[in-house]
Amino acid sequence: MPISYRMLLILTLYIFELCRCVDASERPVVKTEEGVVEGIRLDAGGEKVDAFLGIPYATPPVGNLRFERPLPAKPWKGKYNASSKPAPCMQSDFPIYQDIVLDYTHSSEDCLYYNVWRPTRSCPDDTETCNAKLPVMVFIHGGGFQFGDSSLFLYDLSHLAVRSNIVTVSFNYRLNFFGFLTTETADMPGNMGMWDQVLFLKWINKNIAYFGGDPNEVTVAGHSAGGVSAGLLAASPATKGLLKRIIMQSGTPLSLLAGSTYYSPDKFYDVSRTLGCHNGQAKKKDLDLPKTIKCLKKLDARKIIRSLLRLNLGQRVFSPQEGDDFFPYDPLAMDTWKNVHVKEVFAGSNLNEGTGFLSYILKHHHDLADNLKVDYRATITAMLSLFADVPLVTGKRMVKAYFGGYEVKHEGQKVVELLSEMMGDIVFKCPTHLYSELMALQGLPSYRYLFAYRPSYSIFPKWFGVVHSEELPFALGSLIFSTDPTRTSIATDSLPRGFLGRSYTTNETAFMRQLMDTWGSFVSTGKPSIPLRDDEWPSYTKTRHDIVQLMPFNYTIRFDKSQDKCELYRPFMIRKGAGKQPRLRIVSPGIAASSGKPISPAVASGANRQPGNNVAMSLVACCLLMAMRHLFATIV
């Protein structure tokens, strides 16, 4: 019987509708406070994950909103297409290793976006709401507060979401000049990048339940500068009730902010002059701040980046500062950390954090390399005095702890290796040890790890060992995406063919799963797990410094051997009896946030800073900033 035109049309429409429905099933939909978002369904480790990518959480901080605290995103109508990752925040191109560079010409001021991943199985009905109430992990990327973005394949958290049955989230925050420039007055208090993080945690609290997450079970995790951020957020009065746990990977507040890193009272004056917003004839105290800020807001962002590259490192580094109502306390004061409002802490570092940094420094500072050859003891002692305000007598004791007495002689490579160990202790291991100890003193369950595995695909010399960032693709589950061109970002398009996609072993795949289980256990329960064994992860306490060393198929409980050396640095990283009252330097207009009293001119100008700490521990910041130069070289 011949098919009529009418029947054919009906059949065609039916098939079209069927195809459309099948297509729609691959586009999960969620209704948030701002509007409806439509994500995509992806494969991650053999399972399906719902990904919602590149969604705004704030109004673009452009024009008059540059240097201002972020405003919530405006509501939208219709469905927001959340199928691609966002552009990174404004930054310069990033040298990775030798002539290999990440191309950040596509970076933008319009960058305050987030990504969410959830296991598809947790919300099988494909409705606009999901009541799964899964634990949530919010990850903050590193980069010394100068570089980085959430779109790099390294931070693809989809595999971790399905493996651990949690909701994972990443996001961008303003960096460098755009995120941390400050006048140290109410005209431009600064810390915009940190207020971005605060606003996003508030967004999480209001919206993550729509994605199947539990707003009462939020873990904030971060690497390097992201770890510093997690620690600051845990004590900020602006985030109380917004997070329950923190994970700090190779970075704590004692790492980057120790001694007011790269602080200079003249930085705003100098930078605004470089950018042509005043001619330098007016004295700093006579500078018309509102007029200068208005000028800076009108400048082209890319022109700013190019101009700043002509300055030396100290002039163009902008980092979080204490003294506003985000962080009104002295970060080096022991009493500051009595204000922490999280329940559990998980922190750690890698076995050889200092090797990559020192190698880079020696390559670009031949005078230092030459001085080490002539007299390494005197050179290192002088560096400690210059960069960290360490008295010469104390500096000699520090050098002796690593190099032995004067009767012990070292040469060449051995000097470099011992100095690398010292730098790793100063920048990462000891800040992590001391911060974990401070948490334990507050009665918080605190857990420590030491990542001790050198990947088979490492491109560095063997003596480098296990360098900064090498745990990331294992712990975050992104190792499998290094060979997937669909998971890379625009920034990696400039990399030479073959740089990405290096092979990894089946044992490394298994190790990745073990670390994901450990991280996922902490996010879900507040305690990391030891795979393949019934042993419990020991707490890190004031009297018992147990850590777990991480190797494939071998998690070993051991005593933290670095604590004796860390005692040498304690007086420079933690000040007893200081900071009992908020040490306000910047406040909201006219009012001291903690007391309600008008701010004094001395406080407003930053006059309460200790002169001896203006450049204290800047070696720490220098090393952290250099870490990003080695990021991809150490993981791919």
Language-model segments: residues:
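Classical eukaryotic N-terminal signal peptides for Sec-dependent ER targeting/secretion
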Residues: 1-16, 20, 609-620, 630-636
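Non-catalytic accessory segments of hydrolases
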Residues: 2, 14-194, 215, 485-517, ...
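Serine-hydrolase-like catalytic core of hydrolytic proteins
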Residues: 14, 101-289, 325-327, 333-358, ...
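Extracellular structured ligand-interaction cores
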Residues: 52, 109-113, 135, 342-343, ...
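Non-transmembrane alpha-helical segments in soluble domains
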Residues: 137, 198-201, 205, 231-234, ...
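Acidic/polar loop patches that form or flank catalytic/metal-binding clefts of enzymes
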Residues: 280-282, 304-307, 443-450, 525-535
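Substrate-gating cap/lid region and adjacent catalytic-acid/histidine neighborhood
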Residues: 295-509
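C-terminal GPI-anchoring signal of eukaryotic secretory precursors
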Residues: 588-620
